Amino acid sequence: EEGISDEEIRRVCQYVNADHFIDKLEHGLDEEVRERGNNFSAGQRQLLSFARTIIHKPSVMILDEATANIDTETELLIQDSLEKMRSVGTMLMVAHRLSTIQHADNIIVLSHGKILEQGTHQELLAKHGRYYQLYTLQYHKEQMEE
């Protein structure tokens, strides 16, 4: 885009951890992006979308399943990026993977369009409600897969 320098693009890509794979590309930032970005993994596309968002300095970001369909290594990069992005503006995140939202200021647990409970990760765990049940199930599933 006009008005955005290569230096600013590099800085933002580093900020969201996209530099981890961009530096390995044959043409770096000048790499051709094929239709639907199919020459990149789902996680790489997600990191690029974060960079595109951050470069425009939004006050509100809406993220829907930011860590869906990605490998564990890329999930860690995305989670690190999300943590950094919290300082950019307000984030509204939709997530089934609870590890994605456990550092959120406020978590709202919905079921069939109704709010079941809300609070921080620690507050919701202490309530032993639906969030606690979901977290326990996901945590045990992840432990068994390791």
Pin down the residues of each PLM region.
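ABC-type ATPase nucleotide-binding domains, specifically the catalytic core motifs of the NBD
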Residues: 1-5
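Internal amphipathic alpha-helical segments of the cytochrome P450 catalytic fold
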Residues: 6, 22, 121, 131-132
